[in-house]
UniProtKB/Swiss-Prot annotation:
GO cellular component term, pick one: protein-DNA complex
Protein name: Probable HTH-type transcriptional regulator LeuO
The UniProt record lists the keyword Transcription regulation: yes
Key words, A-Z: Activator, DNA-binding, Transcription, Transcription regulation
Organism of origin: Salmonella typhimurium (strain LT2 / SGSC1412 / ATCC 700720)
Family indicated by similarity: Belongs to the LysR transcriptional regulatory family.
Gene Ontology biological-process entries: positive regulation of DNA-templated transcription; regulation of DNA-templated transcription
Record domain HTH lysR-type: where: 22-79
DNA-binding region(s) in UniProt: 39-58
Keyword Nucleotidyltransferase: no
An example molecular function term from Gene Ontology annotations: transcription cis-regulatory region binding
Source organism, top-level taxon: Bacteria
Amino acid sequence: MPEVKTEKPHLLDMGKPQLRMVDLNLLTVFDAVMQEQNITRAAHTLGMSQPAVSNAVARLKVMFNDELFVRYGRGIQPTARAFQLFGSVRQALQLVQNELPGSGFEPTSSERVFNLCVCSPLDNILTSQIYNRVEKIAPNIHVVFKASLNQNTEHQLRYQETEFVISYEEFRRPEFTSVPLFKDEMVLVASRKHPRISGPLLEGDVYNEQHAVVSLDRYASFSQPWYDTPDKQSSVAYQGMALISVLNVVSQTHLVAIAPRWLAEEFAESLDLQILPLPLKLNSRTCYLSWHEAAGRDKGHQWMEDLLVSVCKR
């Protein structure tokens, strides 16, 4: 009698959470509460009642085995675990949203929030241009700007906590896209009253002068590329938090500074500055627009990318 083979039933690993047992609608509630950090406002955004949102938050706490949100003043404050989850949840929801029928992006009616990092000193020239363009053609869209990179910027781009970065830094990892927008000429700036400088310097003379710089301790400091050795750093006499304050100090002292030509020209008359060619190999910097590749499939992200390129590219 032939042996009859029977298939063994597939047993679920009950020790692991099963996705089919998770109410994925709770993730949209989590996303809204994270953005609003207020139950009432999140309920309004979602078109739900406040008790329904509170109930969903209670279920989320059980799902993730964490408090997620704690009371803080008149609102709530996310826990460390909530912040850890936020980027992944947003990215997952956005990927699903992009595949739904009719998921087009209409800028004239959208109330979307975009988070941009326009790094100093570029924020001095680009932030107002971007803000005014968005306000003109998409008045309901809200753009939130910040002006510096930090150690978490790649993480923020990866999870779309920051959608775009405009800076002199190129993101070289394969998962990021960096598009060159323009190249800035760099110049040497000194006071017109400087006792030793009244014309162009030779390369060997640059570091014989004392320098004012953007703090070299800051992450991705604008000034850092020119002060990458102990000898060059020994010429630094003043470190400020922003390039405008650096130029202000230069105008009142015998220090010199390196700056983009457009910024030096903007303040040359009011601060009585002289602008000289920079006789160093690094005498220009490329400005890049950068984002994470996963965000590129989002239609709203594509719209903002096109707008930023049209505003910023020279």
